[in-house]
UniProtKB/Swiss-Prot annotation:
The gene is RAB35. Changing residue 58 to A: Loss of interaction with RUSC2. Regulated by guanine nucleotide exchange factors (GEFs) including DENND1A, DENND1B and DENND1C which promote the exchange of bound GDP for free GTP. Regulated by GTPase activating proteins (GAPs) including TBC1D10 and TBC1D13 which increase GTP hydrolysis activity. Inhibited by GDP dissociation inhibitors (GDIs) which prevent Rab-GDP dissociation. It comes from Homo sapiens. This is Ras-related protein Rab-35. Its EC number is 3.6.5.2. It is found in: Cell membrane; Membrane, Clathrin-coated pit; Cytoplasmic vesicle, Clathrin-coated vesicle; Endosome. NCBIfam families: small_GTP. CDD domains: Rab35 (cd04110). GTP binds at residues 18-23, 34-35, 37, 39-40, 66, 120-121, 123, 151-152. Changing residue 79 to E: Loss of interaction with ACAP2 and RUSC2.
Amino acid sequence: MARDYDHLFKLLIIGDSGVGKSSLLLRFADNTFSGSYITTIGVDFKIRTVEINGEKVKLQIWDTAGQERFRTITSTYYRGTHGVIVVYDVTSAESFVNVKRWLHEINQNCDDVCRILVGNKNDDPERKVVETEDAYKFAGQMGIQLFETSAKENVNVEEMFNCITELVLRAKKDNLAKQQQQQQNDVVKLTKNSKRKKRCC
């Protein structure tokens, strides 16, 4: 049976508890939003296929629990991850401060993974405490892209997921190109070595 996609990528959504990770996932995967807050126990995931530059990309998006007591569960889910979405709540300064810790955790668990920073709940200017300028400055220092989103109002959610997918797709193609180049170099070396051996005879 033929596959209905060209690429399969695993994405992970991490961040403090209550920042809206599940809401972002539900908005992107099912285009739904629920105002009631339920803590995710352990890990939940959704699947959605998107098209990027004419290629079908199947996304397996894992929503992890942000609470400290679930940290051990979370660490096992980094395996095989291609992209990580780090979420903070623009109405919670603490969740923004904790982004550094989450980025450190990514570095501890993943060798080479694409990352983006997401400031969620960006739909009530009066409650916003993490300034856009500060967030952009921090993202620049970390070398990652920033998106301010609202799962509630459906603002920038699609764009954010498309961005991380494009980053992962580009990284995959770059890695393939490097591998092919390395193989060509190895073939050239082998050919040169065999010619040298013939001359020695």
